[in-house]
Curated annotation (Swiss-Prot):
A matching Pfam family: Trypsin
Propeptide regions on this chain: 31-94
Residues making up the signal peptide according to the UniProt record: 1-30
The encoding gene: blaSE
Protein's UniProt name: Glutamyl endopeptidase
Protein localization: Secreted
Disulphide bond pairs: 126-142, 275-279
Alphabetical keyword list: Disulfide bond, Hydrolase, Protease, Secreted, Serine protease, Signal
Keyword Cell wall biogenesis/degradation recorded: no
Alphabetical GO biological process terms: proteolysis
SUPFAM superfamilies hit by this protein: Trypsin-like serine proteases
Length: 316
């Protein structure tokens, strides 16, 4: 039998609990994901889910977005060589490790090199890579300046640029995308995308990209882009194995330099057959820092994969 005192104490305890709750002690809400998309376009509404079209494949190892070669039709223009300082990376840009083993890409009209783009904006000079007809993947610091808290002005994007030669001309940016985590300068979220004014990807093609939770140590990859220590607008590459495979970063000893930020870290002949061609595993972001002897790129995680896919889809 329950005593009257016990009932009374229970009622008082309940009333106190209700009073405290009503004074603002509400259940804690989950913090927004640092991968939540942010755009330079105020009208942009971030997707809360992702749609995988038939070009997205999956297997027991992960997800894959298929590559596309494009038509390759050249529309060459000659322009004055532009010299602009590389965009400031969050850490060291002096990323040549030992001897410089980069080699110049002399035929930038060959796929996939024509799908690698030179980016020039108010932030500086960078590299990017096509992931769809109108979408370029790049580093977050190439399009959003954390020191000023602002996006870059309109960028000029030149696929397959080769010095003063622009085999496919140049196109302008229309808007930018980054994850919210990059606004605070957290390098785990140093990635983004550029939407273009024209579907140049139909001509130059675009890269596949993939997500996997498996270790990528030993995987042979290539980094190709537009370094600031070489003749302006020339593309250079270096291949080698991934040395360290982390949750958010991949580390490697391939030589890079400022201006190559945003370059694809990709498998040339992908063992990931669902990519159907060159397959990017990360976005190159920075050089040696923090006691490591390796350069680094932001790894394509499930969240990065979904953001790139949504940004690509929103441009079509």
């Amino acid at each position: 039998m329950v005593s009257k005192k016990s009932v009374k104490r229970g009622l008082i305890t309940g009333l106190i609990g209700i009073s405290i709750y009503s004074l603002g002690m509400h259940p804690a809400q989950a913090a927004p994901s640092p991968h939540t998309p942010v755009s330079s376009d105020p009208s942009y509404k971030a997707e809360t889910s992702v749609t995988y079209d038939p070009n997205i494949k999956s297997d027991q190892y992960g997800l894959y977005s298929k590559a596309f070669t494009g038509t390759g039709k050249v529309n060459e223009t000659k322009e004055k060589a532009e010299k602009k300082s590389p965009a400031k990376a969050p850490y060291s840009i002096k990323s040549v490790i030992g001897s410089d083993d980069r080699t110049r890409v002399t035929n930038t009209t060959a796929y996939p090199y024509r799908a690698i783009v030179h980016i020039s904006s108010s932030i500086g000079s960078c590299t990017g890579w096509m992931i769809g007809p109108k979408t370029v993947a790049t580093a977050g610091h190439c399009i959003y300046d954390t020191s000023s808290g602002s996006f870059a002005g309109t960028a000029t994007v030149s696929p397959g640029r080769n010095g003063t030669s622009y085999p496919y001309g140049s196109v302008k940016s229309t808007r930018y995308f980054i994850p919210s985590g990059w606004r605070s300068g957290n390098t785990n979220y140093d990635y983004g995308a550029i939407e273009l004014s024209e579907p140049i990807g139909n001509t130059v093609g675009y890269f596949g990209y993939s997500y996997t939770t498996s270790s990528l140590v030993g995987t042979t990859v290539t980094i190709s882009g537009y370094p600031g220590d070489k003749t302006a607008g020339t593309q250079w590459q270096h291949s080698g194995p991934i040395a360290i495979s982390e949750t958010y970063k991949l580390q490697y000893a391939m030589d890079t330099y400022g201006g190559q930020s945003g370059s694809p870290v990709f498998e040339q002949s992908s063992s990931r057959t669902n990519c159907s061609g060159p397959c990017s595993l990360a976005v190159h972001t920075n050089g040696v820092y923090g006691g490591s002897s390796y350069n680094r790129g932001t790894r394509i995680t499930k969240e990065v994969f979904d953001n790139l896919t949504n940004w690509k889809n929103s441009a079509q």
